[in-house]
Amino acid sequence: AGGIFLALGVPNLSISGMTLSIAVVVPFLNMTKQFCGQIGQISQQINAVVMGLAGADRIFELIDEKPEADEGYVTLVNAQVNPDTWQLEEADHHTGMWAWKHPHRATGEIEYVPLRGDLVMDNVDFGYTPDHEVLHGVSVFAKPGQKVAFVGATGAGKTTITNLISRFYDIADGKIRYDGINVNKIRKADLRRSLGVVLQDVNLFTGTVMDNIRYGNLDATDEECIAAAKLAGADDFITRLPDGYDTMLTGNGAQLSQGQRQLISIARAAVADPPAMILDEATSSIDTRTEAIVQAGMDKLMEGRTTFVIAHRLSTVRNSDAIICLDHGRIIERGNHDELIAKRGYYYQLYTGAFELE
């Protein structure tokens, strides 16, 4: 401000009859500027404190959250075949064979049921709130090794069904059986351990690429992680990274493309070697070339596994054993691709572009 007065050749300033020299005005303006700056900084600090308190409330709310209720008593164990009786029994080491350890409370007998990935949903009703039901009489049957696809508009209930399979929510009515066992009897951690999940929104953690793949199975060796990456089609781009599998990932893998992040997620599921897979829109947000790479890896991963697929691109579900069409929580059509095309109904309209999934 004083520079402006000097440039204009104004040696003094008159305010309300008082004459002030530049020597007085300039320091006053500078001090006012500094004072206002400090006030601005204080307001910013207050905003930071308020945001911190709000975050602290959420943190303490999470800390105080009660543990998830779990009444399950059927557990997943390593199994082996007894050479004398040819019956399954529990093993104290990794055998590559899994079984459900099912104690029968009435008799005290322990039954070992092979983990196969056989799933039955029988007339299931569900609502996120008691007064708003989102699934109505849903029945789904998946034999071991089958690929079952769910299609429908956003909000039809596709993801809700997969959440019920994982028991993130409990059903209001009906039955869900996994390998013939009511899922309510299976311990939740063991149930989820038997399921491989690949989501559209990938979460990568700060650490190496190898560590992020190993999250699927913390006991996996480096060789097993690399084999899983090759199966997923991720090995090619990983080996081109600056440090290969030892490349550090930060910021949820910000240095990788969406397709590359998804390939790592698929490798993470592959290293767990689950008998059942849930693919929730796994290839709906990547380019066509990357989708082809991902799909090739997924086809290998799905061999011999029960797979539930939710995709917005019908090309990814065309080879499914069963396609289930949902509308407002109800199954309106089911069958394979050729059967549904022949019906010329809802799926036919989707496939020919008459309807949109979004």
Summary of predicted features, one role per range:
Residues 64-71, 236-240:
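Proline-centered turn/helix-capping motifs that create local helix->coil transitions or kinks
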Residues 61, 68, 214:
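Conserved E/DxxT/N motif and adjacent residues on the DHp alpha2 helix
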Residues 68-80:
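Solvent-exposed, non-transmembrane helices and loops of integral membrane proteins
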Residues 79-358:
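ABC-type nucleotide-binding domain
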Residues 1-57, 62-63, 88-97, 101:
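Helix-loop-helix
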